């Protein structure tokens, strides 16, 4: 994730802090120390209030931390626990504020596990704790393997397909994919050389009236079965 810090300001305040702490006046030093305690945490306002509140609750522990001694990784470790987040940028604003820009990940598919609907984010994480209002999301059935899904997604996208062009993805026990396209067209991909089959699939869809086709079987090398 991204971090953004004004280095010139850091150096200035570090020098200032060092000089002031060298003055042997405990009350004064205490005032200076408090001056650099975190008093404000600001989150970007492009996410819903419920999520903002949950993140604020977890970040409350950093109030009154000395801003110089707070490691950005400490904040990032908390944000990483929110699977709905796709990206964030933590910025220290001296002397006493944190500003965090947040953005949610795109949802690309969903599946069911023990009757619970689980979403898959573009960030590769499983998302369950938030209400999702995405439309036209494809479902995943059979074996659930996010790594294989993203590998297939990359190959489809390379040849002009998006995941939501399809209704359903089914990963067989053999790790071979079946795809449901336009509600009624079943595409059987081979176990190997998937990308070549996707090229063939693209050509078939472009050059044929697929309304009368129910199955495109590409499992056998150098053979296309339409039925």
Task: Label every PLM stretch briefly.
Residues 1-227:
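Charged, solvent-exposed interaction patches on well-folded alpha/beta domains
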């Amino acid at each position: 994730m991204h971090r953004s810090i004004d280095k010139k300001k850091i150096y200035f305040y570090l020098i200032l802090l060092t000089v002031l702490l060298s003055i042997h006046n405990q009350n004064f030093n205490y005032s200076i120390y408090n001056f650099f305690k975190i008093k404000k945490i600001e989150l970007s306002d492009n996410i819903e209030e419920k999520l903002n509140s949950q993140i604020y609750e977890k970040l409350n522990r950093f109030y009154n931390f000395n801003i110089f001694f707070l490691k950005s990784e400490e904040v990032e470790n908390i944000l990483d626990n929110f699977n709905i987040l796709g990206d964030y940028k933590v910025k220290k604003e001296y002397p006493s504020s944190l500003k965090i820009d947040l953005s949610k990940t795109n949802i690309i598919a969903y599946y069911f596990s023990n009757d619970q609907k689980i979403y898959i984010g573009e960030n590769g994480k499983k998302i369950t704790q938030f209400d999702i209002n995405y439309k036209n999301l494809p479902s995943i059935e059979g074996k659930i393997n996010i790594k294989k899904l993203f590998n297939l997604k990359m190959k489809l996208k390379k040849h002009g397909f998006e995941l939501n062009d399809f209704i359903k993805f089914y990963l067989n026990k053999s790790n071979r994919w079946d795809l449901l396209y336009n509600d009624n067209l079943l595409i059987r991909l081979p176990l190997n050389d998937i990308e070549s089959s996707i090229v063939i699939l693209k050509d078939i869809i472009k050059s044929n009236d697929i309304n009368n086709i129910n199955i495109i079987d590409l499992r056998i090398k150098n053979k296309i079965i339409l039925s």
